[in-house]
Amino acid sequence: LAVRRTLETVYENYRGDRSAAEWKALEKYLKKVWFANGIHHHYSNDKFVPGFTEGYLLDVIETIPEEKFGDLNPLRGEVCKAIFDPALYPTKLNQKAGDDLLLTSSSNYYHNVSQAEAEAFYADMAAADAGNPEPVSYGLNSQLTKDDAGRICERVWKLGGMYSPAIERIVYWLEKAQAVAKEPQKTNIAALVSYYKTGDLKEFDRYNIGWVKDTVSNVDFVNGFIEDYGDPLGRKASWEANVNFMDTEACHRTEVISDNAQWFEDHSPVAEAYRKPVVRGVSAKVITVAMLGGDCYPATPIGINLPNADWIRKEYGSKSVTIDNITYAYDMAAHGNGFNEE
């Protein structure tokens, strides 16, 4: 965030030559940061290489009044190191065998904790809940760190916990929606609000069960710490949200397929041992997304297949959703031969 805010302040306040090659390179770098939500590529996870020098950035900053940067001023050295030091934060997500995946990755999900310590911490947590047919997704909504005594602990993302100011705004708008929602969404939103207030993952499961069972609401949404792609251990999730409405005509076509899900399962080209004898709760629809936020923006998925908890999928099914307007936009963007019009 310090990198982004510093570059945004420069972008908004620089009054020098904006036609210079280094300025164009700085502008391009900032756009990459915007698109990837950070200094690493959103797919390859490699760190961006700036096409401008540290000296140029500092010279540009010197032309802008200090008060424009506010609390960013003391962080200038750290910002420059983050951008220009290739050995610092070289990759967002390292999955190389033999490396400590946490100490060599650049996410904020773990702080001062090794891979072995994290794996042992969650193994103990799972062992204490062994035999539970409905286990929560341990660690999904927290940062793993150490307290002042050196003991490993979780900083839970909830009201009054880590990221509380942002979560307060999420809760505020969810409660606004709850006040005008109809059932079953009113009850589902209440469970989600309870989850954000308490950090209790059982409440998140309750919300997910209600959400996947709701196949009648024309307007639907996804909201929460959902996907764990950014965690090298595949445990902690990034926040995302969208609001969408059904494409009725396209939904009819997908319903024909989902209504015959058992036939497709019975005739799938896999060994019989891997086929489900009874397919449960397959809900497929086509939606138009009206709002995107968090980790699903601006690099947007073309579909949704949730929830992720295996036991919920087994007992209650899942929602498989195609996002029609995003699919269309990607298709239109792919047209052409790759050359500029000129």
Question: Language model features by range: what are they?
Answer:
Residues 11, 15-341:
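Contiguous, non-catalytic segments that form substrate-binding/exosite surfaces or channel walls
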